[in-house]
Amino acid sequence: MAHVLAVYPGTFDPITLGHEDLVRRAARLFDRVIVAVAIAHHKKTLFSLDERMEMARQALADCPQVQVESFEGLVTEFTAARGGTAMVRGLRSGTDFDYEFQLAGMNRALVPGVETVFLTPASQYQFISSTLVREIGTLGGDVAQFVSPGVHERLLHKLGRTAAA
């Protein structure tokens, strides 16, 4: 039987508990999952590519069938080049669906052999986004409940803060 590989792409700046939830769900559905961290030249990221990849590896270290790689360019080409047959995308809201539905159609036109699989996060993670985590953290708020402990530590360090006692 063939092994089924899925790719979960994103910027992961930083990886959140919502991302981790989706990766773990995908790992139950697919034999292998690649967390594809975008090089993202078009975005100003808080964390470097190496930092984002290391945080993802640390957060998902307990998932042996998950690997973390970087990619540049079209994620469909990255997926096809690795023999992937599915891309995993998370949906938190109807707004996410509208955008992701259009993107899935374009991706299917570009690489017909790669399907888009939509997963919804567990209810406690539906409102979490990397953007909000960065904004709350930058403004001095506590984001410990939205990211794993290792990511939280790195975020505090990056923002020049220390953990509350």
Curated annotation (Swiss-Prot):
Substrate binds at T11, K43, V75, R89. Homohexamer. The record marks H19 as: Transition state stabilizer. It comes from the Bacteria. Pathway: Cofactor biosynthesis; coenzyme A biosynthesis; CoA from (R)-pantothenate: step 4/5. GO terms for molecular function: ATP binding; pantetheine-phosphate adenylyltransferase activity. The keyword Hydrolase does not apply. Its cofactor is Mg(2+). GO terms for cellular component: cytoplasm. It is an enzyme of class 2 (transferase). This is Phosphopantetheine adenylyltransferase. It is found in: Cytoplasm. It catalyses: (R)-4'-phosphopantetheine + ATP + H(+) = 3'-dephospho-CoA + diphosphate. Belongs to the bacterial CoaD family. Transmembrane segments: none annotated. The lineage of its organism: Bacteria, Pseudomonadati, Pseudomonadota, Betaproteobacteria, Burkholderiales. Pfam families: CTP_transf_like (PF01467). Its EC number is 2.7.7.3. InterPro entries: Cyt_trans-like, PPAT, Rossmann-like_a/b/a_fold. Keywords: ATP-binding, Coenzyme A biosynthesis, Cytoplasm, Magnesium, Nucleotide-binding, Nucleotidyltransferase, Transferase. ATP binds at T11, F12, H19, G90, L91, R92, E100, Y125, Q126, F127, I128, S129, S130, T131. It comes from Acidovorax ebreus (strain TPSY). GO terms for biological process: coenzyme A biosynthetic process. Reversibly transfers an adenylyl group from ATP to 4'-phosphopantetheine, yielding dephospho-CoA (dPCoA) and pyrophosphate.
